[in-house]
């Protein structure tokens, strides 16, 4: 399944669930006006292509040379490049140098290399029905796993970041709710008949020296995250059934504890 087909398919993914957990109105905002891809995100997409689908990487991204677009030659190059690479992710030459270093170091890391090379499925789209408690209301959940080692019960995800130290990546986990991602993907996978025993994150630095680490998240934390995820899903089911995502924060004065 292509990434575009997956993006267009109906279903609640982690990227929409996280803003919903802030408020239904934030979910609606993200749904109606999704954020534009940043240069860092484009580099991440190119890296995923090189590591997981190298045979079609050239169809996914292209490298644009630095030219002076004020000149006739520069304008001609830019126009031809745009025509030849329509629909692809575009990175620049500096990013390509970083991409090569990231890919090389990822494949030099024993644990990361094993996961990538032994994956039975890569960029695997998964869909499942979530049934709200006490009702017959259902909605579709979706997730796309970077890699699956089906015989070992492993689903893994690749992340790029400036620092892959345990302390800094822990901050990223909290900030971007990678724990919610693990739970959401695990639900989608198990509902699709895929056994999940372990969910490692391959973390690759996008700045020199392009360090690589592989982490799993604390089991006790994930247990608490399951409860948080379930509560959010039940509330989403309520909003989805009523087709009302207008709620935001409390309209009364609230005491803040800290």
Model-derived features with residue positions:
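Coil-to-beta-strand transition motifs
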Residues: 138-142, 149-153, 196, 207-210
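Metal-dependent nuclease catalytic regions and adjoining charged, substrate-binding loops involved
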Residues: 172-179, 184-258
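Conserved catalytic cores of phosphodiester-cleaving nucleases, focusing on short active-site segments
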Residues: 143-171
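Short acidic (Asp/Glu) and glycine-rich catalytic loops that position anionic groups and cofactors
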Residues: 25-29, 162-165, 207-211
């Amino acid at each position: 399944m292509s990434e575009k087909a997956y993006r267009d398919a109906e279903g609640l993914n982690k990227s929409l669930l996280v803003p919903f957990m802030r408020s239904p109105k934030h979910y609606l905002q993200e749904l109606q006006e999704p954020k534009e891809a940043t240069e860092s995100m484009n580099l991440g997409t190119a890296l995923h292509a090189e590591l997981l689908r190298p045979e079609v990487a050239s169809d996914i991204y292209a490298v644009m040379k630095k030219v002076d677009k004020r000149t006739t030659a520069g304008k001609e190059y830019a126009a031809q490049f745009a025509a030849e690479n329509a629909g692809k992710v575009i990175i620049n030459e500096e990013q390509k140098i970083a991409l090569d270093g990231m890919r090389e170091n990822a494949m030099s890391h024993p644990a990361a290399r094993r996961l990538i090379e032994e994956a039975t499925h890569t960029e695997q789209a998964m869909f499942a029905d979530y049934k709200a408690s006490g009702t017959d209301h259902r909605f579709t959940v979706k997730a796309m796993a970077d890699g699956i080692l089906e015989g070992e019960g492993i689903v893994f995800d690749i992340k790029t970041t400036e620092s892959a130290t345990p302390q800094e990546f822990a901050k990223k986990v909290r900030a971007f709710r990678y724990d919610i991602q693990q739970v959401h993907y695990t639900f989608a996978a198990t509902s699709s008949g895929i056994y999940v025993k372990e969910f490692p994150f391959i973390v690759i630095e996008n700045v020199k020296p392009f360090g690589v680490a592989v982490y799993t998240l604390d089991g006790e934390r994930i247990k608490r995250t399951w409860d948080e995820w379930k509560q959010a899903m039940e509330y989403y089911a309520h909003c989805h059934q009523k087709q009302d995502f207008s709620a935001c924060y409390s309209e009364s004065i609230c005491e803040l504890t800290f």
